[in-house]
Regions:
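N-terminal subdomain of nucleotide-sugar transferases
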Residues: 1-59, 80
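Conserved donor-binding/catalytic core segment of Leloir-type glycosyltransferases
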Residues: 9, 187-206, 212-215
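A structural motif in glycosyltransferase catalytic domains
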Residues: 23, 196, 211-212, 227
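A short, histidine- and acid-enriched strand-loop-helix "catalytic/donor-clamping" loop
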Residues: 106-127, 135-138
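Donor nucleotide-sugar binding/catalytic pocket of nucleotide-sugar-dependent glycosyltransferases
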Residues: 134-184, 191, 198
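Nucleotide-activated donor-binding/catalytic signature segment of Leloir-type glycosyltransferases, i.e.
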Residues: 230, 237-258
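Short alpha-helical donor nucleotide-sugar binding micro-motif in glycosyltransferases
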Residues: 257, 265-271, 287
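Acidic donor-binding loop of glycosyltransferase active sites
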Residues: 266-282, 292-293, 299-300
Length: 316
């Protein structure tokens, strides 16, 4: 049971496993209570909520139509004695709209933790997002690119702050300092060809089939390479079919999901480059943390905010 001694109420769509370090930091340094949704349309690994101090309740995300959903029992929290409310900046969450309206009436402050603007919004989406974000007291945005776009749309820059995005950096730094070259890939592939690497959920939006097609072209030109894919197919991509189509089975390692950070660090460290043909997301941060350069596309409206970490010709 919550005692409501905390002044900050955090209501998020879900608590992903990679957010555990930042949420734990928040719970130890800020007077926060946490409420997480139970599921998303696309499966993703959740953190163990019970291990987080000041975790109060899991809310049921009820999907109504398309991507729109309602978080059960979330609206009642606006009437509790919290001063601040930190919400995912998702216009698709209809209960968030109600919380924002009530917070205005009750003179409570609200903060969005959000991607913000992408640059590909239609006229209708622009109208909806402008109204939605205008209801917040402050906006915590992942990247400077989004802040720049939102400033041009008329948002007050003084109410926006760039918070970037990260993984468990402290732990990853310890691992990185102890990494050294290994034979992980030469042993598996029985060759010493350059290694392309991808980690993350295997989704259609990631366009991983482009890597397979590029590998075939390189092979025909006499420059064979290997590919390692770490992650679960959550979108019916069936990458194995594309691999078989180009007869590249001996050059592709479909590793599957992995949450052993020491193992992940070793794979990044020994790979030549990380490739994400679609939006790159946190994969870019993960890769650069271990010194592995990143290749992705430069159509920024269709990128994740983490693309800003890639410096052309230097880190990717």
């Amino acid at each position: 049971m919550a005692d409501y001694n905390s002044s900050i109420c955090c209501i998020f769509n879900i608590g992903t496993h990679y957010r555990n370090p930042i949420y734990s930091k928040m719970s130890s340094e800020l007077p926060c209570d946490f409420y997480f949704g139970d599921r998303l349309l696309t499966p993703i690994k959740k953190m163990d909520y019970t291990q987080l101090n000041h975790f109060r309740s899991e809310l049921h995300n009820k999907y109504l139509f398309s991507q729109f959903y309602w978080q059960s029992k979330s609206v009642r929290l606006v009437f509790k004695p919290y001063t601040y409310y930190v919400l995912d900046g998702e216009p698709y969450c209809l209960s968030s709209w109600v919380i924002l309206f009530w917070a205005k009436l009750l003179n409570k402050r609200t903060v969005a933790w959000t991607h913000g603007w992408y640059g590909r919004e239609s006229i209708v989406k622009k109208v909806i997002k402008k109204l939605f974000y205008s209801l917040f007291s402050e906006l915590m945005v992942y990247g400077e690119y989004a802040i720049s776009l939102m400033s041009k749309e008329g948002f007050d820059k003084s109410k926006m702050v760039c918070i970037a995005n990260s993984l468990d950096y402290d732990n990853q730094l310890k691992i990185r300092l102890n990494l050294s070259p290994s034979s992980i890939y030469s042993t598996h592939f029985s060759n010493s060809y350059p290694v392309l690497f991808y980690i993350g959920r295997v989704q259609k939006s990631k366009k991983l089939e482009y890597i397979i097609q590029a590998m075939d072209i390189l092979k025909q030109k006499g420059f064979p390479v290997n590919l390692v894919v770490v992650g679960k197919d959550v979108d019916g991509v069936h990458l194995d079919c594309e691999i078989a189509k180009y007869n590249l089975g001996s050059h592709v390692w479909l590793y599957g999901p992995c949450y052993d950070e020491m193992r992940i660090g070793e794979m990044f460290y020994n790979a030549d480059v990380c490739v994400s043909p679609g939006n790159v997301g946190l994969t870019a941060i993960h890769s650069l943390t271990y010194g592995c350069p990143v290749i992705t596309h430069n159509n920024f409206p269709f990128q994740g905010p983490e693309f800003e970490s890639i410096i052309q010709g230097k880190t990717g």
